[in-house]
């Protein structure tokens, strides 16, 4: 029997260091990051592959965020590595300005992989002049499907400030080309006994699935000005910690040990209070762990809907002739409502007259919240006939309100996720402001936005908000959404099949929730380490 050959493309992880970078800032040091572009095709179009994090005030940065790229043996993959000092989001080489660039290095992926230890060290240049050195290390990723979840604390760490320290730690995986940074913790201020939040890493990022691969944990004291102070380090591997062979590790500072000779014991002790392998958390893991789902409904009250009292109005609504708004509320709300933890749904209006003037975000009805889908439909039927419609169709205020409210009380130990259902009949009048609010919400708010288009409009702007075309949503200042949080569906495409409407509008919610949780390193509460 012939063994089937896997046709999946290998994936390669690229990690980076730089040194001796030219300083582009006047009053401080540059804030470098590395952007990677893949030059493809006969016309040489440069495709954005990924970028590292930005490291502030550092001319010798060591980046913890890697860039992942598919490896095509059969193709020449010309890669450009551009070191920049920049604040705005960039996705195209053409968007870079000359004064943003510290330096650039171009090579092929094949050249990096074929080098001894899969490592390249080269000068970077800008306008023909050397402006620093870049070090690129490559490693093929072996997908494991597991995560390494651990929690550590420290005791009696060395004082590096007057009375205390501000400790943080770095994890390096060893390789034939040297140690490679794979994780850096947050700084805990003013303590010699730090207690860190749980950390979850993909096993392939930590050790590429090799449970005996040596890991180096370095502890440092953070200084806001000047160089950070080294506290000490220890080495171990995942197998040792998982099996509980050793859970306590003394931090050793070799220079301090040499000075103090026989009197030196350690520079503190690090304890793994728990450690385990877990699968990638699922949407159900978060729900069963206690993550609350909250539903908000926003109803378009603009004049383009037509007077609710006329039969041609999109808001014309009777028990025997429910409007498209009512049908959408019932269809989508019936699926979402069972997940709403307390059964209360907030109903908002926008584009109508509220308290004497046009409002783009107001309480729809006499109650701030109503019970279930039935309550939403009852409120809609009571309020819409007497609603004074206005204009224009603005989304900014509604999205801003929902984004802020979704953050109320949300922590890793109190997880909530909000779904904002917007029902609208027309094109957005405040497109730039709306895009800005969505981009901002994608970075910080536990929020998904479901938009249902009512009526016969073309909804071109709505399709732009929905990132399903593969292009990340970018606002006028160049900031790009870190996750896709918008799903748009025209009601008329599914008017004959309400179940299909709900399926289409809600199918991306699980991945959007997972995106927020991963972005913030929130574990399912049932997975949390004590």
Curated annotation (Swiss-Prot):
It comes from the Eukaryota. Residues 294-513 form the VWFA domain. GO terms for biological process: cellular response to calcium ion. Residues 1-125, 130-253 form the C2 domain. One of its GO terms (cellular component) is cytosol. Keywords: Calcium, Metal-binding, Repeat. Ca(2+) 2 binds at residues 25, 85, 87, 100. Pfam families: C2, Copine. PROSITE patterns: C2 (PS50004), VWFA (PS50234). GO terms for molecular function: calcium-dependent phospholipid binding; metal ion binding. InterPro entries: C2_dom, C2_domain_sf, C2B_Copine, Copine, Copine_C, VWF_A, vWFA_dom_sf. This is Copine-B. The gene is cpnB-1.
């Amino acid at each position: 029997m012939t063994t089937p050959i896997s046709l999946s493309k290998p994936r390669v992880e690229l990690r980076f260091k730089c040194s001796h970078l030219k300083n582009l800032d006047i009053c401080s040091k540059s804030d470098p990051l590395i952007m990677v572009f893949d030059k493809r095709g006969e016309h040489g179009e440069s495709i954005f592959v990924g970028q590292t994090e930005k490291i502030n005030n550092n001319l010798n940065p060591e980046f913890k965020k890697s860039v992942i790229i598919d490896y095509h043996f059969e193709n020449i993959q010309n890669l450009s590595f551009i070191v920049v000092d920049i604040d705005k989001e960039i996705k195209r080489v053409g968007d870079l300005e000359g004064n943003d660039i510290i330096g650039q290095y171009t090579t092929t992926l094949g050249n990096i992989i074929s080098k001894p230890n899969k490592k390249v060290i080269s000068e970077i240049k800008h306008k023909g002049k050397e402006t620093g050195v870049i070090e690129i290390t490559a490693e093929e990723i072996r997908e494991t499907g597991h995560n390494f979840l651990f929690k550590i604390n420290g005791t009696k760490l060395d004082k590096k400030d007057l009375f205390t320290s501000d400790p943080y730690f770095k994890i390096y995986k060893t390789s034939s080309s040297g140690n490679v940074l794979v994780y850096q913790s947050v700084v805990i201020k003013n303590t010699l006994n730090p207690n860190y939040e749980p950390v979850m890493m993909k096993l392939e990022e930590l050790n590429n699935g090799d449970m005996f691969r040596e890991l180096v944990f370095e502890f440092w004291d953070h200084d806001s000005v000047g160089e950070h102070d080294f506290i000490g380090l220890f080495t171990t591997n995942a197998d040792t910690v998982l099996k509980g062979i050793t859970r306590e590790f003394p931090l050793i500072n070799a220079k301090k040990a040499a000075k103090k000779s026989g009197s030196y014991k350690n520079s503190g002790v690090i304890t793994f209070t728990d450690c385990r392998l877990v699968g990638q958390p699922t949407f159900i893991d978060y729900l069963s762990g206690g993550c609350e789902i909250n539903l908000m409904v926003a109803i378009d009250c603009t004049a383009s809907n037509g007077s609710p009292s006329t039969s041609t109005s999109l808001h014309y609504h009777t028990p025997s002739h429910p409007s498209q708004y009512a049908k959408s509320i019932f269809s989508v709300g019936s699926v979402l409502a069972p997940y709403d933890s307390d059964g209360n749904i907030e109903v908002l209006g926008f584009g109508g007259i509220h308290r004497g003037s046009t409002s783009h975000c107001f309480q729809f009805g006499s109650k701030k919240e109503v019970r279930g889908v039935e309550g939403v439909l009852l409120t809609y039927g009571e309020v819409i006939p007497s609603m004074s419609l206005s204009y224009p169709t603005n989304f900014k205020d509604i999205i801003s309100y929902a984004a802020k409210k979704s953050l109320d009380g949300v922590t890793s130990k109190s997880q909530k996720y909000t779904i904002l259902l917007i029902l609208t009949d027309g094109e957005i009048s405040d497109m730039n402001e709306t895009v800005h609010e969505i981009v901002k919400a994608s970075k910080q708010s536990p929020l998904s936005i479901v938009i249902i288009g009512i009526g016969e409009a073309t909804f071109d702007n709505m399709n732009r908000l929905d990132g399903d075309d593969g292009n990340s949503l970018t606002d006028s200042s160049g900031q790009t959404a870190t996750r896709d949080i918008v799903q748009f569906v025209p009601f008329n495409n599914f008017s004959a099949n309400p179940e299909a409407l709900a399926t289409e509008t809600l199918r991306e919610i699980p991945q959007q929730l997972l995106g927020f949780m991963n972005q913030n390193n929130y574990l399912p509460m049932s997975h949390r380490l004590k």
